[in-house]
Regions:
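Short polybasic amphipathic segments
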Residues: 148, 164-180
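Predominantly a Rossmann-like dinucleotide-binding segment in NAD(P)-dependent oxidoreductases
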Residues: 21, 28-113, 238
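Short, mixed charged/polar active-site loops
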Residues: 130, 156, 184-188, 213, ...
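Alpha-helical elements of Rossmann-like donor-binding domains used by nucleotide-donor carbohydrate transfer enzymes
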Residues: 10, 36-39, 91, 120, ...
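Contiguous beta-strand/loop segments that form the cofactor/metal-binding neighborhood of enzyme cores
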Residues: 89-166, 198-211, 246-247
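Active-site loop of classical SDR/Rossmann-like NAD(P)-dependent oxidoreductases
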Residues: 189-201
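Beta-strand-loop-alpha-helix segment that lines the small-molecule cofactor/substrate pocket
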Residues: 1-29, 44
Length: 247
């Protein structure tokens, strides 16, 4: 929704003042694979969650960045975390819960750009769970993986593929009717964008007609933006950064 924390806050404030809706696209939440994972968490099937890891191993050659002047810039794009991995960073809070703190490292290892092409973020959730976000745009020779793995007291699951489109591991101490949907929830895709956008826009239309509440509004967008900004502050200053940020 923004590349700067204060810009995101200002967007929410001004929309509130004007009495208009602010919608933020979070299409990955609509994936059938992640809907199953979300329900498993909500139903307590994991028990206590111990660890969660997100991997975004994609490829963006120099020609991609050279193709448009805004790409690879701090002002208009952001780096691998802010741009390509932002929808995966969104899963950190949406699935596992509020984050206590982050410790991040970012680097520009191969591309001629202002921003990072590679990053890793250590995460501690308020629940005590630990995990990481690992991102690179340098995967050879093409996009390899967009995944989330959750390890808990009573269950382990991995949703992977190139764009969280395949349930690759699904094992719990108990059984649930959702277990029968695991195979059908997975799908093949050649696009990292998935197929969640139509369902997102369906919610937007319903909201504008007064038939629903916005599922991903401006305040929801701030949750992942806050985590992103905290990660950049951590990498810049070489320290652990606690959340929430100062408003």
């Amino acid at each position: 929704m923004a590349t700067r924390w204060q810009d995101g806050l200002e967007m929410v404030r001004r929309c509130d003042q004007a009495g208009v809706q602010l919608f933020v696209v979070k299409q990955n939440r609509r994936n059938a694979t992640l809907q199953l994972l979300k329900r498993a968490i909500q139903r307590g099937r994991f028990g206590r969650i111990y660890m969660a890891t997100i991997n975004v191993f994609w490829s963006r050659p120099q020609s991609y960045y050279d193709g448009a002047a805004w790409r690879g810039t701090w002002e208009f794009d952001g780096g691998a975390l802010m741009n390509q991995a932002s929808h995966y960073v969104d899963l950190v809070d949406w699935l596992v819960g509020p984050v206590e703190s982050v410790q991040a490292y970012v680097a520009t290892l191969a591309r001629n750009i202002q921003v990072e092409d590679t990053a890793t973020v250590g995460v501690r959730w308020r629940s005590g769970a630990l995990g990481s976000i690992n991102v690179t745009m340098l995967t050879y020779p093409k996009n390899l993986e967009g995944s989330i793995t959750i390890i808990g007291e009573k269950g382990t699951a991995k949703v992977g593929g190139v764009a969280v489109n395949q349930i690759q591991h699904w094992e719990f101490a108990d059984s649930d009717p959702d277990d029968e949907e695991v195979r059908s929830a997975s799908y093949e895709t050649t696009s990292v964008y998935g197929f969640g956008h139509p369902l997102y826009y369906e919610n937007v239309v319903k909201v504008l007609r007064g038939a629903a509440h916005a599922e991903t509004d401006g305040r929801e967008g701030l949750r992942s933006l806050e985590l992103l900004i905290a990660s950049y502050i951590s990498a810049r200053d070489g320290r652990r950064v606690a959340l929430p940020l100062e408003y």
